[in-house]
Amino acid sequence: MSELLDLPRRILEDLDGAVVGKRELKRLLLIGMLAGGHVLIEGPPGTGKTTTARAFCQALGGVFKRIQFTPDMLPSDVTGFYLYRTDGDSRFIEGPVFANVVLADELNRTTPRTQAALLESMAEGQVTIEGVTHTLPRPMMVIGSQMPYGGPGTYPLTTVQADRFLLHGWSGMPSVEEEREIVGAIDRIERNIVNPVVGPQAILDLRREVAMVHVSPLIVQYILSLLEVIRAHDAVAEPVSPRVGIALFKASRAAAYLDGRDFVLPDDVKALFTSVVYHRLVLKPESEADGRTREDVVRATLEAAVVPRGQEFEG
């Protein structure tokens, strides 16, 4: 491990000064960044989704853009458009998706067509406007926030769209102690500005180090076992895609790196399984009618899959 490992720890320290609590969510954002993926944050209004995401974006440095999604937004408001002049010439006006870190706020407040414009750019790393392809900056990370499904005026992401996010995190209500701290220190919190800790090149360097973390064949088999069990669960309507296994592989490496290890343990996989699979999971209508939840399916899967024990996981 190199001195680069100190950078994620410094980001966490700065986030703690700007956002009360939410330690698990902060760690999840870091894992997403290190793994080269995008993160979807879900929670009710006023629980710090935007505040946490904005502070994290500030700490990452580079070019930061925020998109406040609304029902009347067009795809061109996200990706950009060509501006034509009277003499026949044109120039491309970049949309807010052209950034190193994009905060997609209240993503499920806009129409599926506009959602797709963002999510396709996330998957491809480029946008095509009027037949011309424009490459997005590297690195490019999207942090999406959304209201809980079923809220008024929401457009739930499709399974394919949700699959573009590596991880899903919850932003729940603060504890009594956390809420007391928030209320008592609100002036300081609102004034706090998170200074950039890293930049685009440092993020790319960190990702290269994460890619060197060893993943034992036993860990790979454990990941595949989890996929096999959850696909066979009688409450699941659609088998989860192979992207789940890939996401779990990448996120587990990032978690191990964040903990100062150059190898993955089964506990890394177990700890991240819910965040990787939850937003990709679709239950049968009759299962939901019976009161079964995605949490139930995830819990049953973790209990059923055989965890490798007493083995050598180091490379």
PLM feature spans:
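Conserved AAA+ ATPase small/helical "lid" subdomain
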Residues: 193-248
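Pre-Walker A (pre-P-loop) alpha-helix and adjacent loop at the N terminus of AAA/AAA+ ATPase modules
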Residues: 3-44
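Walker B catalytic acidic pair
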Residues: 43, 105-106, 117
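Walker A/P-loop
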Residues: 33-70
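C-terminal engagement/docking regions of AAA+ P-loop ATPases
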Residues: 232-315
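Conserved alpha-helical scaffold flanking the Walker A/P-loop in AAA+ ATPase domains
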Residues: 28-31, 84-103
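AAA+/P-loop NTPase substrate/partner-engagement loops
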Residues: 59-87
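Canonical AAA+ ATPase core
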Residues: 85-88, 106-110, 114, 122-213, ...
